């Protein structure tokens, strides 16, 4: 059956992914299974999406109940779940207004439009962005323009003009790019695709000051590093700053496709109005029910406390690999978005781990990304470490 499923996809689906030769059928907790029942420990969580793990009964029951009521209705009408989900996100972000999207890429596009509209409303004439080298903000055209990897932009040029790239964690490089056309500075609080690079508190606070001093908006992209993964609801909350706009997606719906961008009162009252932006599916009853139930379970299960308890153990086990394995160089990141820098080819290591029943993915050119479901325990960390040692040997 496994080969049949792979052949069906190869025949029907446009090849934009280099898939591993495994078919996933179902999951439970931090584990996934193929159709024949082979078990895999998941340390990728669907690219940091499945934070509650798989087959969470309370979450599943909430979705089933909402499906029985209504999945979708037009944004021309109010529904019973959108407002609550928005309030739930306001509570954990401290933001003033929220707009629901279907993905992180759409959230980035909304943030771009919000920043541009704010500049238009304020009659500043500003339209340019400063983004970071090695950043990743998505696959849509605006998001690609902000992504600091030339290989992602080049095939689609000309992309959105007026984007300049600074060096991450280097305030002087940011200051050198600021001009009277800069409308926003955008960055990931922890770079995921770029190699698990965490912004320093000094850098984040410096960006905030640059923005305040120059009338520029600060946008934090928390699509991958947000929703508890850093040990706080959102990683910027550990930095002593508040952005003007933030983006989120992935884990906020625990696997249901939903994203959002949120903003302060100042931005909300001077940016998007009816006719400026919209979405067909965003804010639909099913996705919003998923957001609210995810947040409810996070709070009930004290998920942030759990992340802060298990993350140092993950760091310890990764450091032990560095100390004992010639191919391991350095541990990066924090919380449950960590990375192991290695000297062996990423593809070789991930393939060997897959054979041993461990799902891991790369970040950048030389980092193994550790973004497991947030529900993992020490026993799963131990299991991962043993398999990874074999894969690096």
How would you label these PLM feature ranges?
Residues 1-393:
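Conserved N-terminal phosphate-binding loop of PLP-dependent enzymes in the Aspartate aminotransferase
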């Amino acid at each position: 059956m496994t080969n049949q499923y792979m052949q069906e996809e190869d025949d029907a689906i446009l090849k934009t992914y280099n898939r591993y030769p495994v078919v996933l059928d179902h999951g439970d907790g931090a584990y996934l299974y193929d159709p024949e029942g082979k078990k895999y420990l998941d340390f990728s969580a669907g690219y940091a999406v499945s934070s509650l793990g798989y087959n969470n009964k309370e979450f599943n029951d909430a979705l089933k109940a909402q499906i029985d009521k209504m999945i979708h209705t037009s944004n021309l009408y109010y529904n019973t779940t959108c407002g609550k989900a928005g309030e739930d996100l306001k509570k954990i972000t401290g933001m003033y207004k929220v707009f629901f999207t279907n993905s992180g890429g759409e959230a980035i596009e909304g943030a771009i439009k919000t920043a541009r509209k704010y500049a238009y409303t304020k009659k500043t004439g500003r339209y340019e962005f400063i983004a970071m080298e090695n950043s990743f903000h998505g696959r849509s055209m605006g998001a690609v323009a902000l992504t600091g990897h030339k290989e992602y932009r080049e095939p689609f040029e000309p992309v959105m003009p007026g984007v300049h790239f600074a060096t991450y964690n280097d305030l002087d490089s940011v200051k050198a790019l600021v001009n009277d056309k800069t409308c926003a500075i955008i960055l990931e609080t922890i770079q995921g695709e770029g190699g698990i690079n965490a912004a320093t508190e000094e850098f984040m606070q410096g960006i905030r000051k640059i923005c305040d001093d120059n009338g520029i908006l600060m946008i934090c992209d928390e699509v991958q590093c947000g929703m508890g993964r850093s040990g706080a609801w959102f990683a910027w909350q550990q930095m002593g700053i508040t952005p003007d706009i933030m983006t989120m997606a992935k884990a906020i719906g625990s696997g249901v496709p939903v994203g959002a961008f949120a903003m302060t009162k100042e931005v909300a009252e001077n940016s998007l109005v009816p006719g400026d932006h919209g979405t067909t599916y965003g804010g639909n009853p099913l996705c919003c029910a998923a957001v609210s139930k995810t947040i409810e379970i996070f709070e009930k299960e004290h998920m942030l406390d759990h992340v802060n308890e298990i993350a140092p153990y993950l760091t310890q086990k990764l450091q032990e690999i560095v100390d004992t394995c010639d191919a391991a160089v350095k541990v990066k990141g924090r919380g449950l978005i960590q990375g192991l820098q290695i000297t062996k080819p990423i593809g070789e290591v991930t393939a060997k781990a897959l054979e041993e029943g461990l799902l891991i993915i790369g970040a950048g050119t030389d980092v193994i990304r550790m973004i497991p479901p947030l529900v993992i325990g020490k026993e799963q960390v131990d299991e991962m470490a043993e398999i990874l040692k074999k894969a690096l040997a």
